Swiss-Prot record:
It comes from Leuconostoc citreum (strain KM20). This is Putative competence-damage inducible protein. Belongs to the CinA family.
Amino acid sequence: MKAEIISVGTELLLGQITDTNRPYIARALHDMGIESYHQSIVGGNAADILTTLRLAAHRSDLIILIGGLGPAVDDLTKQVVSQFINSSLIPDTEALRKLKKWHDAVDVEMADNNYRQVLFLEQGKPLKNDFGFAVGSFYQSNDGPDFLLMPGPPWEMVPMFDHYVVPLLERQYLHGQVLNSLVMRYFGIGESRLSQLISDLMISQTNPTMTTDAKKHEVTIRLTSKASSEALAENLNQKAAAKINTLVGDYFYGYGAHNSLEKVVANLLEENQQTIAMTEVFTRGLVQSTLQNALSQTETLAGGFNGMSALLDLTDDEIELSGDNGAQLVSRLAQLTQQRLGADIGLAILAETPESNGQHDYVNEKVWFGLVSHQERLLVTSQSFAKDHQDNVEDAIFVALDLIRRHLSQQNLVDRA
């Protein structure tokens, strides 16, 4: 099954709007086992749309067009497709009722061209638009490709696709199979290294499929399985996840497409009823603020300091931090932080003097992390960063969060991979 995705809109061609719709749909199609080998953008010109359709019809089984369903003069997608497949356009009565009701409610006379939005391909299926007026269409052909038409605004397209199109495609093309996706999240390992470690599994594993995705501070693996029931599909994913984590489990921190490292740490702190205090000389309170956004209990954060002078009888400038005394100083600072603020956990983050590495604004910064708890567990680690200072700070925030997570999960520290 091959699908082709075509975005329609002159504003896309001119770079005035970034097209987020095509990648969103392509990822979802891949998860369903429907591959998209061709994608394109075409302006709102009837001749250009028709030329693109002729090419797509020769090489694809499903042609997906996004945009051009509105009331404007250059919203021509439905009209060109109806001409191409020799079908009429008819109004969707429910959508027309919604459109008229809205105009009555705001006491505005409806312009005639608004009527175009509620038209869909005759003998096709109208697709409901919960956040707009432009109706989508799904049309199955007996002797050519099928057509799927959706509105261009992402806030209309995404809900339509998720709520109505995905179930429709599953019924039409998956033949009773159920899809289940599982997202696994990893921190402290790069995509290239992770892919290398699980490469044999990725090659041999066909159900579920495995795809990796590099985020700014982490890597995710998406597993997508097909089975005759939701329970069987979920079981396939869980078995594959267990195999993956025998290889890279040291870096695994959680499941879920909308999960995050700070959410996991916040949950662990609250579940274990632990309070934490921090001295952030390098990150200047950003670990606390990041964590605070994920916490439901504000008392979990016992407070903190952005400098060492409040805890030591020296100013920050008078303390010379180096590899010789970094571990000792950050350990002492974590202990003092915990004691002074009466927390279960004390965390300290310090950095050695940065050095320019001669590349733009990049600087080499070695950062020390220390964590101490009432259980007399002491974790100390250091990491070198070599981006611009702000990026180094952002990276350090997540290293600190992972240190807290490893303490609460009773996991050992591992080297960055």
